[in-house]
A protein has these predicted regions:
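Catalytic and binding regions of secreted/periplasmic enzymes and modules that target cell-wall glycans
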Residues: 102
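C-terminal alpha-helical interaction appendages
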Residues: 1-94, 106, 118-137
Length: 137
């Protein structure tokens, strides 16, 4: 993982944190984001969206989602949601899988359920364990 990729992992983690500041239901926001055109743009080798900043990215997701973005539901702690956002982006760089494919393997419920166990692990180990959980389904 290079420095730029790690910075983009941090940006995505902070983007997810901003959804907490906006009091968006976390599960709905994460699902919407991971299946969005914004996430797809971040998956590309180079896209201007990667350097747009988390505030702009959040506005893009909210605008594109329209009424589909649920403002109800549990709002996760910033620690949990940052880790989820960071790991999802790290996973993309680690495996080159799309955000949509990653979300299919580890939906938000899986990420939240395993946070306490996995957040202290090296990202690669957590990702491999999450992939193993998916394979066992």
């Amino acid at each position: 993982m290079n420095e730029i990729q790690l910075k983009l992992c941090d940006i995505q983690g902070r983007l997810f944190e901003l959804s907490v500041d906006r009091q968006l239901g976390s599960a709905g926001f994460i699902k919407t984001f991971m299946n969005s055109e914004t996430a797809k743009a971040l998956d590309s080798t180079y896209n201007r969206m990667q350097w747009a900043g988390e505030e702009y990215l959040l506005e893009e997701v909210i605008e594109a989602a329209g009424d589909k973005l649920d403002e109800t539901g549990e709002v996760y702690s910033k620690d949990v949601i940052y880790w989820i956002g960071y790991i999802y982006r790290y996973w993309h760089y680690y495996t080159e899988e799309s955000s949509k494919a990653i979300y299919k393997q580890a939906p938000v419920e899986t990420m939240k359920r395993n946070y306490l166990m996995f957040h202290t692990m090296a990202p690669e180990v957590a990702i491999e364990d999450l992939k193993e959980i998916y394979k066992q389904k």
